[in-house]
Amino acid sequence: MSYLLVDVGSTFTKAALVDDRGGLLARAAVPTTVGPGRDVLEGVAGVCRALGPGGSVPDPLDPAERDRVLVCSSAGGGLRLAVVGYERAVTAEAGHRVGLSAGAKVVHVATGRLTTAGVADLRAARPDVVLLVGGTDGGNAEVLLHNARRLARSRVGAPVVVAGNVEAQEEVAAELARTLRRATLTDNVLPRIGVVHPGPARRAIREVFLEHVIGGKGLSRGPRFAQLVRAATPDAVLAGVEVLADVRGGDVMVVDVGGATTDVYSVLTPQGEDASLRKHVVATLWHARTVEGDLGMRWGAPGVLEAAAAEALPVADDPQLRSWVERVHARPELLPTTAQEHEHDLVLATTAATVAARRHGRPGAPGEAPRPLKDVRLLLGSGGVLRHAAPGAADRVLAAVLADHGGGWRPPADAGTRVDTAYLLFAAGLLAGERPDLARAVAAQL
């Protein structure tokens, strides 16, 4: 018996076929079929055909085989999340970090009491889900209740996940129910000062995404696609990193360099609080994801040069590289053909990965310690530019990250490097909930 794992991305639909022992039987990728008159299920059917002959691949549209088909998606903009919190450096920051760990693209963060202008800004961000947080358990609930009333009266139609002061949740739910708002209550993301509790909110965001969001993006004409999707793609990838860390028995860090963004994931072993940590800041999120929306190989290429200049990296002054960046930004489908163009892409990837790793590892707020990455045992590279790189090229990118000792963070001291060449992290993550044994077998191949 085989399992079909599919990632419907904004550009490509990728799939892996694994057997009942976790062995990789086949993998394939086809362009995602999005746009007017298109249906993403066309791309899913296409990638199934590319995997192998009829009969060898589970049929995603056959209800009898649906348990063997697991899909994640970032098409249609993925999961757009807005965070409404109290203090920017505390509850709102905790909500922001938890939202990223849930695989969301955080499109707006509002702090303090929502005003008329604040509600307008929130609505303009077009969130798919609003994460409403505020206060520690048993603490001040005034701002949380005020914001619940504002949301209830607003024209923001997105469902609300409430993850604030649990002692005020019944009142918050009552306020939202007055105008029939779709609300999901879950545990506080910051139950007490210095403690982040991400798991319940992450699960609630995932459930709301699957129940209310994915079916409303216009990606497919019927309900079948929404019934297949189990997670937003970054959520599945983080779950895969968690499985990989468990299999490896140590801390893992992943740098995923994409066309528009560069994501960094880390799964770390909890440690004692740093002695320099101030009492009011948000504690370390041990399973974390950060997204750098200005760093990418094509749509995000200009941002790489801007970040290089801000970080005082010398590549920002290369006129030939700047010319290449202008070309690929204007034509994202452009691929390098000459040795010089391949070198330009490698420099872009190295710079994006290095800056993204710095931002992931640096303190998130004044008074915090850097993220404790020094004990990471595996740095895994991902993204098309690394998967399809010439021999040794991806090693250069990852080696540069590990050698970055002047970037205001603590790089891993003794980490090995690998590249997810078969693109299996998402597959391990999708299997983690349904078949953890297969998830571990898939992750062991990385």
Language model segments and positions:
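Nucleotide/phosphate-binding catalytic cleft detector across ATP-hydrolyzing
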Residues: 1-5, 20-22, 30-38, 42-45, ...
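Asp-based phosphoryl-transfer active-site loop
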Residues: 4-14, 256-262, 379-382
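Short glycine-rich, Thr/Ser-proximal phosphate-binding strand/loop in the N-terminal lobe
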Residues: 12-40, 101-105, 277-301
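Short beta-strand scaffold segments in enzyme catalytic cores
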Residues: 13-19, 81, 254, 262-267
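Short acidic-glycine loop/turn motifs at beta-strand connectors
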Residues: 19-23, 75, 258-261, 268-271, ...
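Short acidic (Asp/Glu) and glycine-rich catalytic loops that position anionic groups and cofactors
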Residues: 23-25, 288-290, 327-336, 403-410
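Long, internal scaffold/assembly segments composed of regular secondary structure
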Residues: 228-302, 306-307
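A glycine- and small/hydrophobic-rich beta-loop-beta segment
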Residues: 304-364
